Amino acid sequence: MEPPQVPAEAPQPRASEDSPRPERTGWEEPDAQPQELPEKSPSPALSGSPRVPPLSLGYGAFRRLGSCSRELPSPSPSWAEQPRDGEAELEPWTASGEPAPASWAPVELQVDVRVKPVGAAGASRAPSPAPSTRFLTVPVPESPAFARRSAPTLQWLPRAPSPGSTWSRGSPLAANATESVSPAEGCMVPPGSPACRCRCREPGLTKEDDALLQRAGIDGKKLPRAITLIGLPQYMKSLRWALVVMAVLLAVCTVAVVALASRGGTKCQPCPQGWMWSQEQCYYLSEEAQDWEGSQAFCSAHHATLPLLSHTQDFLRKYRITKGSWVGARRGPEGWHWTDGVPLPYQLFPADSEDHPDFSCGGLEEGRLVALDCSSPRPWVCARETK
């Protein structure tokens, strides 16, 4: 590629009244008229070393708006292409008497672009079109020396080459800078950096989540909306917490049920059919009448005995048995005693036992113990402990 030729004066695009107008540089003559240069016209001689522009970035310079300097810097690869964290950065030129790059105001980038169309195939004899020269003025909103990391909120435009330009055609730095910015990801920092992972990652299922679902045989499209919104890991974490809360509530309910059951009142102890349950004992109230011996035999057949006042006094008082039913007391050679052989207390002796010495069986009348004839038929009560 031939080096671009520097025109005497190139037409500039018409700018609006609000946009700043670029000043004339030292290369332009006040009374010079625009003219077209031939294809192989020699470049004007400049004092000092020859100024060779970069092959891919063109020839241009940064100039502060409102600057009074008319001298353009000599382009060199050291400031035209400077890698910074995998991206191409341009180092601005500071004229004498101007502030440092850190305090620059908005600048203008003037670029001399020489476009030389590629001719037809070698076998074709058609002449190639003449090259055209364009002098472009591009306003830059911020100083190029301003580091990207110091202003993460600024949004950078994607560096895509325009048709007919030489951008990223021969410069590896420009190509790397274009590849490092992925518009699809919406992130202007390198894809592997933590800032991009935190800021550019969209909610939803990732590739790892899809792989896990496919391995488990679950279709990711049929999952609830909550999973697609917050992601599978966050959903599983919330599900685990819900299971923990449910387990705690279940344990509390189990403890409460056991405590209430243990503090319950009386336990239901079954008694034979026709028997009554009271105070941990079963009672049988007969509707027939028999002598004392027959009544005791009936109770013994049902693993019971005639009631003992020491154990059944409350029950007999509650039901007010006043028909003179038999009780488990009898007089023997050694005095009155219960059917289990325990002697009766003196205060429980029948009052009329001395008047009727032949009455040897005890009965209950009007709530008190009396001596009765053992052969007389009377109703009876059987008592036994629950099993």
Curated annotation (Swiss-Prot):
It is a single-pass membrane protein. The gene is Klrg2. Residues 15-27 have a biased composition (Basic and acidic residues). InterPro entries: C-type_lectin-like, C-type_lectin-like/link_sf, CTDL_fold, KLRG2, NKR-like_CTLD. One of its GO terms (molecular function) is carbohydrate binding. Disulfide bonds join 299-382, 361-374. It comes from the Eukaryota. PROSITE patterns: C_TYPE_LECTIN_2. This is Killer cell lectin-like receptor subfamily G member 2. Keywords: Disulfide bond, Lectin, Membrane, Phosphoprotein, Transmembrane, Transmembrane helix.
